[in-house]
A protein has these predicted regions:
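Ser/Thr-rich, low-complexity intrinsically disordered terminal regions
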Residues: 1-129
Length: 129
């Protein structure tokens, strides 16, 4: 974890991925899977990660809402979006926000990296660069 990430985390209590992210690690992930197959794989993978609780799933809009408690007792609200980009391709974006007013010291960034790492392990053979 870089010093810059920690400094940003002093003030910011959210992090998200997108196509336009300046940092490569925060770019949207694309997989060579239909949206339905991508949804199944992402949903089942997220349910198996210790420390994360799936609160809500809305397959029609491709959103999975998770919650994670940090070691310091803060709660992170995480939204994972599985989007259709073509008939045989889907995209996965993650948004994580801390409850409370103080910065997260990079916790949301680490959560996104952990979730993407788990998804890449499970879906690596389908990943597109």
């Amino acid at each position: 974890l870089s010093l810059k990430r920690t400094l940003v985390g002093l003030f910011r209590s959210h992090e998200g991925t997108s196509d336009r992210a300046k940092e490569p690690a925060l770019k949207t992930r694309y997989y060579n899977l239909t949206k339905d197959k991508g949804w199944e794989e992402v949903s089942s993978t997220l349910k198996k990660i210790p420390g994360y609780k799936v609160l809500h799933e809305v397959q029609s809009v491709g959103e999975i809402i998770l919650e994670k408690k940090t070691a310091f007792g803060r709660t992170l609200d995480i939204t994972v979006s599985v989007l259709n980009t073509s008939p045989s391709r889907c995209a996965v974006d993650i948004y994580s926000a801390s409850r409370g007013s103080l910065g997260d010291l990079g916790a949301n960034y680490r959560v996104i990296m952990r979730l993407y790492d788990s998804l890449d392990k499970k879906l690596g053979k389908h990943k597109l660069d």
